[in-house]
C-alpha cells in the first residue's frame, strides 16, 4: 500500500493542448468503419523509434547495451481486455512524453481535423503526424510505459478526458523502449483475437523492417516421459495436494492391476498446459531486393501504403537497380496527391528511406534527392556506403552524389512514361506541376527534360493543355518565337490587350497563370531552338510583310509629336512612349523592359511579406507606354494636341489614359483614390453636371474640401494629377 500511495503522489496531471483535445474528441465521438488503422499507426511509430536507436548505435554502439534485440511485440490479453505493443526502440524521456503525447500540437493537427470534417478518411491520420491518437478509436484508456537511455522509466496514462498523467514507473523494468497498453472498449474485443491481429498486421505492416512477433496464450496436451524425474516429482506433489480421493477411486476400480497401471501411465503422459505461442508476422523479404518481374502491382501497393501511411494507392512506381562500380537498388513511388505541407520549409522531409545493405540508416537524407522532387516516396538500398555513416559524411559522399544523379534520372524517366497516359498525367500534373517548374528554376542540367513535361493552356488549346513540343509542331512557317503571357487567371490573360494582335495574326499564345511560372520562364529562355517571348515586354517582333512595315513607319512619323508630348506630360512615370504593333481594340498599354519584372511579377513580389525593398527598387518594371495608331481615341488626341499642345484637357486625358492602361496591363495604382475622383469628374461631365453643383452636395461637417478633388482643368491641380503613378 505505501508503495502504491507513493506512486499516486508522484503522478502529475497535464491538460491536452486545445487542438489535440479537439482531435481526440472527434476520434472518440465519430463513427469510423476502418478503426483497424490504429494498429498500423502504432506499429509505424514503433518502427520509427527502432530506426532512431539503430541510427544512434551506428556511431555509439553502447546505446544498445540496454537491449540489443530490435523488435516489436504484440501481446493480446483476453482476461484483461488489453492489447499491448512493445518496442525496443529509443524510448522517450519525461519531456518527450509530455511534449509528444499531448501538450505540443503538431503542425498537422488542425489540418487533419479540417480534412476530417470535410469528409476525408480517418486512415489519413498518419500523414499528419498525429497517428498515436488513433489508439482511441478502439481504446477507452491508453497507458504508455517508456524508458530512454538518458532518463528513468515513466508511465503516461489518459482516458481522453482532456488531460493525462505522467509519473515515474516502479513496475517491471522494460530496459529500453516503449510499451503501449490499450484498454479496449467493450465493443472492440476483436483486436485481441489472434486471427484479427494477424490480418491487420499483414494488411498494413508486413513490410516493416523489424520482426513483429505476436504472443498468444494457448493450451496444449503435454506428454511427460518417465525419465523426466523432476516433472514426475511435481506430478506426485500435485497428487498429494489433491487429497485422498484419487487413491480411493483407484482402489474401487482396480480389479485388474494391469488396467490401473495403464490408466496411471496415461494420466502421467498427458496434461493440459498453458503456453505462450510466438509467431513472427512479417517474414516477407524486403520487396526492393526482389526481381521487379516477380512483384504484382498489389504488392507494390501494399508496400507503398506501409511505407507512407497513405490510404490511397500510388500513381506510378519505378523499381530499378544499378550495378557496376556502384551498386544500389531503389524503389520510387509517385503519390496520387500532394501532401498538405509539400512546400513547408522548416519541416524535415522523410520521403526516401536510406538503407545500407538492408540496414535502415535514415529517412530524412536531404542529399539523396533535390528539393523539387520532395514528393517522391521510396527506399534506396546501397551496397557501397559504410554502415556507420554520419550525416556530415553523407554531405561529402561521392557515392551519394552518384546515387542522387541516378534517382533524378529515373524520376524523369518515370514522369516521361506517365506522360504517355493522358488521364494519369493530368492527375500527376495537377498535383505536382509546381515541383516541375521549381525544377526548371533550380536544375540547369535537367532543364530540357523537365521543359518537355510542362503543360499550359493556350489561345488555341481550348480547355485542354498543350505541351511545348505540341506548340512547336503547330508553329507557323515564319514564326521564330514561342509567345506567352503571364497573369492571374486564364480569363484575365485571354482578354488582355497584349494578346490582341498576336492572336489576330493567328499566332498561338501560351497562358501561364501560376505565380511560379514567372520564376520558371526566367530560366527557360528557349525550347527546341525557339526563344520564349513575353507578349507583355518591349521589343515584341511579329513577322511582317513589306506593306505592314511601311504602314508602321508612317504611323511612327505621324504620331511622333504626340509620343513626345505624352512623354513630357508623364515624365518619370514612363521610360518612353512608342507606337505599338501589338494592339487592335485597346487604345494603349503599358509594356515592361526586357529584363525587368512583368506586371504579374511585380504583383507577386509586392505580396511577399519578407521582400527585399532594395531589390524592388531596381527590378520594378521600367514602364513603356505603347499607343495604338489605329484607335479613334489616339487619333482624336493627336489632332487635339496638334491644335494646342498646352491644352489642359490633353494633359488630363493623357494621365487618365496612362492610369487606365496601368490597370488594364495588370499593374496597381499607387493612389487609386485620385484616379477614382478623376473618373467621377468624367462621369459628371458626361451627365452634364455643372462643376459648381459639387459644393452644396458636401456635408458641412465633411473634412474634405471641394478643392481636394482634382478637377480636369486648372493650373493648381494639374501638378497634383501628374503625381499619380
Swiss-Prot record:
Query: InterPro entries of this UniProt entry?
Result: HATPase_C_sf, Heat_shock_protein_90_CS, HSP90_C, Hsp90_fam, Hsp90_N, Ribosomal_Su5_D2-typ_SF
- Pfam families (UniProt xref): HATPase_c_3, HSP90
Where found in the cell?
Cytoplasm; Dynein axonemal particle
Q: Which residues carry this modification: Phosphoserine?
A: 225, 254
What coarse category fits the chief subcellular location reported for this protein?
Answer: cytoplasm
Q: Where is this region: Disordered?
A: 220-269, 691-725
Query: Record's domain comment?
Result: The TPR repeat-binding motif mediates interaction with TPR repeat-containing proteins.
The entry assigns this protein to a family as follows: Belongs to the heat shock protein 90 family.
The subunit field of the Swiss-Prot or TrEMBL record says: Monomer. Homodimer. Interacts with unc45b.
Q: What is this protein called?
A: Heat shock protein HSP 90-beta
Name its species.
Danio rerio (Zebrafish)
